[in-house]
Amino acid sequence: YKRQLLADPDQTDVVVRHLWRSIPGEDPKATLISDPVLLALPRLRRLIAENGDREIERVQFDDGEEIAISRFPEQAVDEVVSNAFIHRDWRLPGPVVVEQTYRTLKVTSPGPLPPGVTVDKLLTTTSVPRNNRLMAAMRTLGLAEESSRGFDRMWATMIRTGRDVPEVFATESHVQVVLAAQQPDTTFIKGLRKLSERYGEAVIGSVATLIVLWHLNFAPLITVATAARKTQLTALEVEELMGVLVELGLLDSVADASEWTLSGEARKLLGRGQAGDLATVSIQEWIEAKLLDGESLRSADIADQTGVSVAEAGRILRHLRSLGRAQIDPEGPPRGRGTRWIRA
Protein backbone atom coordinates (compact mmCIF):
# COMPACT_ATOMS: atom_id res chain seq x y z
CA TYR A 1 0.00 0.00 0.00
CA LYS A 2 2.84 2.39 0.83
CA ARG A 3 4.28 1.65 -2.58
CA GLN A 4 1.16 2.85 -4.39
CA LEU A 5 0.99 5.94 -2.20
CA LEU A 6 4.60 7.09 -2.11
CA ALA A 7 6.84 5.09 -4.43
CA ASP A 8 7.24 5.20 -8.19
CA PRO A 9 5.23 2.46 -9.89
CA ASP A 10 6.74 0.24 -12.55
CA GLN A 11 6.90 1.79 -15.99
CA THR A 12 4.00 -0.38 -17.12
CA ASP A 13 1.96 0.12 -13.94
CA VAL A 14 -0.68 2.68 -14.97
CA VAL A 15 -2.34 4.30 -11.94
CA VAL A 16 -4.84 6.46 -13.86
CA ARG A 17 -6.22 6.36 -17.39
CA HIS A 18 -7.87 9.65 -18.42
CA LEU A 19 -10.00 9.52 -21.56
CA TRP A 20 -11.16 12.80 -23.10
CA ARG A 21 -13.84 13.02 -25.79
CA SER A 22 -14.96 16.35 -27.21
CA ILE A 23 -17.77 14.60 -29.11
CA PRO A 24 -19.63 11.49 -27.84
CA GLY A 25 -18.58 8.38 -29.73
CA GLU A 26 -15.26 9.67 -31.04
CA ASP A 27 -11.98 7.94 -30.25
CA PRO A 28 -10.77 9.31 -26.92
CA LYS A 29 -7.57 11.19 -26.29
CA ALA A 30 -5.91 8.98 -23.69
CA THR A 31 -3.54 10.19 -20.99
CA LEU A 32 -1.86 7.50 -18.91
CA ILE A 33 -0.49 8.45 -15.49
CA SER A 34 2.05 6.14 -13.83
CA ASP A 35 3.06 8.41 -10.94
CA PRO A 36 2.68 7.49 -7.26
CA VAL A 37 -0.67 8.53 -5.81
CA LEU A 38 0.72 11.67 -4.16
CA LEU A 39 1.68 12.98 -7.60
CA ALA A 40 -1.05 11.30 -9.62
CA LEU A 41 -3.88 12.98 -7.68
CA PRO A 42 -2.91 16.61 -8.35
CA ARG A 43 -1.91 15.80 -11.91
CA LEU A 44 -5.29 14.21 -12.58
CA ARG A 45 -7.12 17.16 -11.02
CA ARG A 46 -5.23 19.56 -13.28
CA LEU A 47 -6.05 17.43 -16.31
CA ILE A 48 -9.76 17.41 -15.47
CA ALA A 49 -9.72 21.16 -14.84
CA GLU A 50 -8.04 21.88 -18.18
CA ASN A 51 -10.94 20.22 -19.98
CA GLY A 52 -13.84 20.85 -17.62
CA ASP A 53 -13.18 23.80 -15.31
CA ARG A 54 -14.63 26.23 -17.79
CA GLU A 55 -17.24 28.76 -16.87
CA ILE A 56 -20.67 27.83 -18.19
CA GLU A 57 -22.79 30.31 -16.22
CA ARG A 58 -22.51 33.41 -14.05
CA VAL A 59 -24.81 34.23 -11.14
CA GLN A 60 -25.29 37.74 -9.79
CA PHE A 61 -26.81 38.06 -6.33
CA ASP A 62 -28.92 40.91 -5.01
CA ASP A 63 -25.96 42.37 -3.09
CA GLY A 64 -23.99 42.74 -6.33
CA GLU A 65 -21.69 39.76 -5.80
CA GLU A 66 -21.13 37.71 -8.93
CA ILE A 67 -19.83 34.15 -9.07
CA ALA A 68 -18.83 31.89 -11.94
CA ILE A 69 -20.29 28.39 -12.23
CA SER A 70 -17.82 25.93 -13.74
CA ARG A 71 -18.74 22.92 -15.81
CA PHE A 72 -17.81 20.57 -12.97
CA PRO A 73 -17.59 22.05 -9.43
CA GLU A 74 -14.03 21.86 -8.10
CA GLN A 75 -15.04 20.42 -4.72
CA ALA A 76 -17.17 17.69 -6.31
CA VAL A 77 -14.28 16.76 -8.61
CA ASP A 78 -11.85 16.68 -5.66
CA GLU A 79 -14.14 14.39 -3.70
CA VAL A 80 -14.91 11.95 -6.51
CA VAL A 81 -11.24 11.66 -7.49
CA SER A 82 -9.99 11.32 -3.89
CA ASN A 83 -12.62 8.68 -3.12
CA ALA A 84 -11.62 6.70 -6.19
CA PHE A 85 -8.06 6.40 -4.88
CA ILE A 86 -8.79 6.13 -1.18
CA HIS A 87 -11.42 3.41 -1.40
CA ARG A 88 -10.26 1.43 -4.43
CA ASP A 89 -9.13 -2.14 -3.85
CA TRP A 90 -5.37 -2.05 -4.38
CA ARG A 91 -5.25 -5.85 -4.45
CA LEU A 92 -7.00 -5.77 -7.82
CA PRO A 93 -5.14 -4.91 -11.02
CA GLY A 94 -6.09 -2.02 -13.24
CA PRO A 95 -6.08 1.78 -13.03
CA VAL A 96 -8.66 4.31 -11.97
CA VAL A 97 -10.39 5.27 -15.23
CA VAL A 98 -11.67 8.80 -15.79
CA GLU A 99 -13.89 9.36 -18.83
CA GLN A 100 -14.61 13.02 -19.53
CA THR A 101 -16.69 14.94 -22.06
CA TYR A 102 -18.06 18.48 -22.04
CA ARG A 103 -21.21 17.15 -20.34
CA THR A 104 -20.16 14.27 -18.08
CA LEU A 105 -17.34 13.17 -15.81
CA LYS A 106 -17.28 9.43 -15.12
CA VAL A 107 -14.80 7.98 -12.61
CA THR A 108 -14.45 4.20 -12.27
CA SER A 109 -12.28 2.57 -9.60
CA PRO A 110 -11.40 -1.13 -9.21
CA GLY A 111 -13.15 -3.10 -6.49
CA PRO A 112 -16.55 -2.95 -4.77
CA LEU A 113 -17.75 -0.40 -2.25
CA PRO A 114 -16.02 -0.58 1.16
CA PRO A 115 -17.40 -3.19 3.60
CA GLY A 116 -20.76 -2.22 5.05
CA VAL A 117 -21.51 0.45 2.44
CA THR A 118 -24.33 0.16 -0.13
CA VAL A 119 -25.39 2.52 -2.92
CA ASP A 120 -28.60 3.44 -1.10
CA LYS A 121 -26.73 4.36 2.12
CA LEU A 122 -23.74 6.28 0.80
CA LEU A 123 -24.72 9.43 2.68
CA THR A 124 -25.41 7.82 6.03
CA THR A 125 -22.85 5.02 6.43
CA THR A 126 -19.33 5.60 7.72
CA SER A 127 -17.14 3.35 5.62
CA VAL A 128 -14.54 1.03 7.13
CA PRO A 129 -11.27 1.30 5.17
CA ARG A 130 -9.87 -1.85 3.61
CA ASN A 131 -6.42 -1.06 4.98
CA ASN A 132 -6.05 1.03 8.13
CA ARG A 133 -2.38 1.84 7.44
CA LEU A 134 -3.15 3.23 4.01
CA MET A 135 -6.05 5.29 5.34
CA ALA A 136 -3.94 6.59 8.23
CA ALA A 137 -1.16 7.65 5.85
CA MET A 138 -3.57 9.41 3.49
CA ARG A 139 -5.30 11.07 6.44
CA THR A 140 -1.97 12.37 7.72
CA LEU A 141 -1.20 13.77 4.27
CA GLY A 142 -4.58 15.49 4.06
CA LEU A 143 -6.01 13.14 1.42
CA ALA A 144 -8.70 11.62 3.64
CA GLU A 145 -10.74 12.37 6.75
CA GLU A 146 -11.65 10.32 9.82
CA SER A 147 -15.24 9.85 8.71
CA SER A 148 -16.41 9.17 5.19
CA ARG A 149 -18.08 12.44 4.20
CA GLY A 150 -16.95 12.57 0.57
CA PHE A 151 -20.33 11.65 -0.88
CA ASP A 152 -22.04 14.23 1.36
CA ARG A 153 -19.88 16.95 -0.13
CA MET A 154 -20.41 15.69 -3.69
CA TRP A 155 -24.19 15.81 -3.21
CA ALA A 156 -24.13 19.21 -1.50
CA THR A 157 -21.81 20.82 -4.06
CA MET A 158 -23.84 19.65 -7.05
CA ILE A 159 -27.11 20.87 -5.52
CA ARG A 160 -25.60 24.20 -4.43
CA THR A 161 -24.56 24.82 -8.03
CA GLY A 162 -28.05 24.00 -9.32
CA ARG A 163 -27.39 20.50 -10.67
CA ASP A 164 -28.67 16.98 -10.02
CA VAL A 165 -26.78 14.80 -7.56
CA PRO A 166 -24.18 12.29 -8.83
CA GLU A 167 -25.13 8.84 -10.07
CA VAL A 168 -23.34 5.92 -8.44
CA PHE A 169 -23.14 2.38 -9.80
CA ALA A 170 -21.43 -0.42 -7.89
CA THR A 171 -20.64 -4.06 -8.65
CA GLU A 172 -18.23 -6.58 -7.13
CA SER A 173 -15.59 -5.50 -9.66
CA HIS A 174 -15.85 -1.70 -9.71
CA VAL A 175 -17.49 1.48 -8.42
CA GLN A 176 -18.49 4.21 -10.86
CA VAL A 177 -19.48 7.80 -10.05
CA VAL A 178 -20.93 10.09 -12.72
CA LEU A 179 -21.19 13.88 -12.52
CA ALA A 180 -23.33 15.68 -15.12
CA ALA A 181 -22.56 19.31 -16.01
CA GLN A 182 -26.13 20.14 -17.05
CA GLN A 183 -27.46 23.70 -17.23
CA PRO A 184 -27.20 25.18 -13.73
CA ASP A 185 -30.49 26.39 -12.24
CA THR A 186 -29.46 29.96 -11.46
CA THR A 187 -32.81 30.86 -9.89
CA PHE A 188 -32.33 28.03 -7.39
CA ILE A 189 -28.74 29.11 -6.67
CA LYS A 190 -29.87 32.65 -5.89
CA GLY A 191 -32.79 31.31 -3.88
CA LEU A 192 -30.47 29.23 -1.69
CA ARG A 193 -28.52 32.38 -0.82
CA LYS A 194 -31.74 34.08 0.30
CA LEU A 195 -32.85 31.03 2.28
CA SER A 196 -29.46 30.89 4.03
CA GLU A 197 -29.77 34.55 5.01
CA ARG A 198 -33.29 33.99 6.31
CA TYR A 199 -33.02 30.60 8.04
CA GLY A 200 -29.29 30.27 8.68
CA GLU A 201 -26.46 28.54 6.84
CA ALA A 202 -26.38 25.71 9.39
CA VAL A 203 -29.92 24.74 8.37
CA ILE A 204 -29.73 25.30 4.62
CA GLY A 205 -26.18 23.89 4.36
CA SER A 206 -27.21 20.46 5.65
CA VAL A 207 -27.03 17.92 2.84
CA ALA A 208 -30.41 16.45 3.86
CA THR A 209 -32.05 19.90 3.75
CA LEU A 210 -30.45 20.62 0.38
CA ILE A 211 -31.82 17.35 -1.01
CA VAL A 212 -35.31 18.21 0.23
CA LEU A 213 -35.12 21.74 -1.23
CA TRP A 214 -33.86 20.45 -4.59
CA HIS A 215 -36.80 18.04 -4.76
CA LEU A 216 -39.28 20.78 -3.83
CA ASN A 217 -37.78 23.04 -6.47
CA PHE A 218 -39.54 20.85 -9.03
CA ALA A 219 -42.33 19.09 -7.13
CA PRO A 220 -45.17 20.58 -5.08
CA LEU A 221 -44.60 18.27 -2.11
CA ILE A 222 -42.35 15.59 -0.71
CA THR A 223 -43.60 12.46 1.04
CA VAL A 224 -41.84 10.66 3.86
CA ALA A 225 -41.06 7.74 1.52
CA THR A 226 -39.50 9.99 -1.12
CA ALA A 227 -37.54 11.96 1.48
CA ALA A 228 -36.22 8.77 3.09
CA ARG A 229 -35.12 7.39 -0.28
CA LYS A 230 -33.39 10.58 -1.41
CA THR A 231 -31.74 11.58 1.88
CA GLN A 232 -30.97 7.94 2.76
CA LEU A 233 -32.30 8.56 6.27
CA THR A 234 -34.77 6.35 8.12
CA ALA A 235 -38.44 7.32 8.15
CA LEU A 236 -38.10 8.30 11.81
CA GLU A 237 -35.09 10.52 11.04
CA VAL A 238 -37.01 12.13 8.17
CA GLU A 239 -39.95 12.91 10.45
CA GLU A 240 -37.55 14.52 12.93
CA LEU A 241 -35.81 16.57 10.21
CA MET A 242 -39.10 17.75 8.73
CA GLY A 243 -40.41 18.63 12.17
CA VAL A 244 -37.44 20.96 12.69
CA LEU A 245 -37.87 22.53 9.23
CA VAL A 246 -41.58 23.09 9.90
CA GLU A 247 -40.80 24.71 13.27
CA LEU A 248 -38.33 27.04 11.56
CA GLY A 249 -40.94 28.02 8.98
CA LEU A 250 -39.11 26.57 5.99
CA LEU A 251 -41.72 23.87 5.30
CA ASP A 252 -45.44 23.40 5.91
CA SER A 253 -47.11 20.10 6.81
CA VAL A 254 -49.84 18.82 4.50
CA ALA A 255 -52.90 18.13 6.69
CA ASP A 256 -52.10 15.28 9.10
CA ALA A 257 -50.14 13.28 6.55
CA SER A 258 -46.39 12.68 6.48
CA GLU A 259 -46.04 15.09 3.56
CA TRP A 260 -44.55 18.55 3.31
CA THR A 261 -44.47 21.57 1.01
CA LEU A 262 -42.37 24.71 0.95
CA SER A 263 -43.80 27.43 3.16
CA GLY A 264 -45.13 30.53 1.43
CA GLU A 265 -42.09 32.55 2.47
CA ALA A 266 -39.66 29.83 1.35
CA ARG A 267 -41.42 29.55 -2.02
CA LYS A 268 -41.04 33.28 -2.55
CA LEU A 269 -37.37 33.32 -1.52
CA LEU A 270 -36.61 30.32 -3.73
CA GLY A 271 -38.17 32.09 -6.70
CA ARG A 272 -41.13 29.76 -7.07
CA GLY A 273 -43.80 32.46 -6.86
CA GLN A 274 -46.15 33.49 -4.10
CA ALA A 275 -47.88 31.32 -1.55
CA GLY A 276 -51.37 30.14 -2.41
CA ASP A 277 -53.31 27.26 -3.86
CA LEU A 278 -51.45 24.80 -6.02
CA ALA A 279 -51.74 25.39 -9.75
CA THR A 280 -53.27 22.65 -11.86
CA VAL A 281 -49.86 21.60 -13.19
CA SER A 282 -48.63 21.32 -9.59
CA ILE A 283 -51.61 19.18 -8.69
CA GLN A 284 -50.68 16.86 -11.55
CA GLU A 285 -47.18 16.61 -10.06
CA TRP A 286 -48.72 16.01 -6.63
CA ILE A 287 -50.79 13.14 -8.04
CA GLU A 288 -47.74 11.65 -9.76
CA ALA A 289 -45.72 11.86 -6.54
CA LYS A 290 -48.46 9.96 -4.71
CA LEU A 291 -48.68 7.29 -7.40
CA LEU A 292 -44.90 6.88 -7.50
CA ASP A 293 -44.99 6.20 -3.77
CA GLY A 294 -47.34 3.30 -4.44
CA GLU A 295 -50.58 4.92 -3.32
CA SER A 296 -53.95 4.48 -5.00
CA LEU A 297 -56.14 7.56 -5.46
CA ARG A 298 -59.77 8.38 -6.11
CA SER A 299 -60.86 11.63 -7.73
CA ALA A 300 -62.65 12.49 -4.49
CA ASP A 301 -59.41 12.00 -2.49
CA ILE A 302 -57.59 14.42 -4.77
CA ALA A 303 -60.39 16.96 -4.55
CA ASP A 304 -60.44 16.80 -0.74
CA GLN A 305 -56.69 17.29 -0.39
CA THR A 306 -55.95 19.82 -3.14
CA GLY A 307 -59.12 21.89 -3.43
CA VAL A 308 -59.84 21.18 -7.10
CA SER A 309 -63.17 19.81 -8.24
CA VAL A 310 -63.78 16.08 -8.60
CA ALA A 311 -64.28 16.63 -12.32
CA GLU A 312 -60.92 18.40 -12.66
CA ALA A 313 -59.20 15.64 -10.67
CA GLY A 314 -60.71 13.07 -13.01
CA ARG A 315 -59.51 15.02 -16.04
CA ILE A 316 -55.94 15.09 -14.72
CA LEU A 317 -56.03 11.35 -14.01
CA ARG A 318 -57.23 10.61 -17.54
CA HIS A 319 -54.47 12.84 -18.89
CA LEU A 320 -51.89 10.87 -16.91
CA ARG A 321 -53.37 7.67 -18.32
CA SER A 322 -52.87 9.03 -21.85
CA LEU A 323 -49.22 9.66 -20.95
CA GLY A 324 -48.82 6.10 -19.67
CA ARG A 325 -48.24 7.21 -16.07
CA ALA A 326 -51.50 6.13 -14.43
CA GLN A 327 -54.09 3.40 -14.80
CA ILE A 328 -57.31 2.29 -13.15
CA ASP A 329 -56.69 -0.29 -10.45
CA PRO A 330 -57.78 -3.59 -12.10
CA GLU A 331 -58.77 -4.97 -8.70
CA GLY A 332 -61.40 -2.27 -8.16
CA PRO A 333 -64.46 -0.92 -9.99
CA PRO A 334 -63.71 0.32 -13.54
CA ARG A 335 -65.92 3.41 -13.22
CA GLY A 336 -67.82 5.47 -10.71
CA ARG A 337 -66.92 7.24 -7.46
CA GLY A 338 -65.13 4.18 -6.08
CA THR A 339 -62.67 3.95 -8.99
CA ARG A 340 -59.09 3.97 -7.80
CA TRP A 341 -56.06 4.91 -9.85
CA ILE A 342 -52.55 3.49 -9.49
CA ARG A 343 -49.16 3.95 -11.11
CA ALA A 344 -49.04 2.53 -14.64
Residue ranges and their predicted role:
Residues 2-344:
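C-terminal regulatory or interaction extensions
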